[in-house]
Amino acid sequence: MSTAGKVIKCKAAVLWEEKKPFSIEEVEVAPPKAHEVRIKMVATGICRSDDHVVSGTLVTPLPVIAGHEAAGIVESIGEGVTTVRPGDKVIPLFTPQCGKCRVCKHPEGNFCLKNDLSMPRGTMQDGTSRFTCRGKPIHHFLGTSTFSQYTVVDEISVAKIDAASPLEKVCLIGCGFSTGYGSAVKVAKVTQGSTCAVFGLGGVGLSVIMGCKAAGAARIIGVDINKDKFAKAKEVGATECVNPQDYKKPIQEVLTEMSNGGVDFSFEVIGRLDTMVTALSCCQEAYGVSVIVGVPPDSQNLSMNPMLLLSGRTWKGAIFGGFKSKDSVPKLVADFMAKKFALDPLITHVLPFEKINEGFDLLRSGESIRTILTF
């Protein structure tokens, strides 16, 4: 029996208030309106940004159905939808691509003006919600809301992918992998034979390493205070790893000496102000490039010496690895299918969706790289 055009009752993880566990609830998911798509979720990853919603460091309207790194199958479409059809495998896009705004029209820009990250409304593009629970409307998150058996997204926030792709793996292309990989290949534009330093060896940091390796870097130095992360970093391409706690002098001095005067490219994948300045400082003063990859949106201002830039360094950042989402996600999935990179090293745990709170405990304890929830 077709569910198209009907309200679907299903399970979702609702966050009713900050700093509380997710509550598995029965929710009602309205059918898609014009230019909207309803998706049956198959797999979703647990990303640090979702935990920032729980902790309150990423402020978004509550109650909310969070989740933004996922893959699923189109259940039904609203009128006027042309880029996907029912049965298509898809990845929701937390950074939309409307194709019409000045950012989408700019060759380098990818932070579409229709995003819900700059000033979160927690709604669809038309300002309303498709979720109801206990008679109350529930907010959307970044236009995706993947912690639900069904979700509704705008057409500008979904990409059709290869019908043969394993959704429980390629869901990582919806955020973590692409954010790291793109920071190396697209934002920094890492060059053949270069030396790179990557601060923070979580899932996104490992993806940065994969990007540096794919771009042909000769040396990739992983930096983390948890030496348990070094083996995995080397498995995906790090040539050496250093622990700042093993040295009496500041780690930027250690890295500058190791690289004969500074690395070509550095990446801060932690979201700490002190390590951002450290990463900038350790890159070569005349032509080094440092990229800020991870940062909680409530971060404080930092102080730095502008002479670090005056000598010739470049300091930059990007959302979603600088990729234009709707254009790039299908290509990244095709590259994965062509074995140009692996996603298995990033996945440490797979849990049923109902165990979402366990998955977040694994993230907070540092035990997991990526936990995938399956529906």
Curated annotation (Swiss-Prot):
Binding site for NAD(+): 49, 200-205, 224, 229, 293-295, 320, 370
Binding locations of Zn(2+) 1: 47, 49, 68, 175
Cofactor binding comment, as recorded: Binds 2 Zn(2+) ions per subunit.
Location(s) in or outside the cell: Cytoplasm
Positions bearing N-acetylserine: 2
SMART domains: PKS_ER
GO MF, one example: zinc ion binding
GO biological process: retinoic acid metabolic process; retinol metabolic process
Pfam families documented for this protein: ADH_N, ADH_zinc_N
Names of the cofactor(s): Zn(2+)
Catalytic function, reaction form: a primary alcohol + NAD(+) = an aldehyde + NADH + H(+); a secondary alcohol + NAD(+) = a ketone + NADH + H(+)
Residues that bind an alcohol: 49, 68
Residues binding Zn(2+) 2, per UniProt: 98, 101, 104, 112
PROSITE patterns documented for this protein: ADH_ZINC (PS00059)
GO CC list: cytosol
Coiled-coil annotated residue ranges, if any: none
Similarity section: Belongs to the zinc-containing alcohol dehydrogenase family. Class-I subfamily.
Subunit structure as annotated in this protein's UniProt entry: Dimer of identical or non-identical chains of two types (E and S) coded by 2 separate genes at different loci.
Protein name per its UniProtKB record: Alcohol dehydrogenase E chain
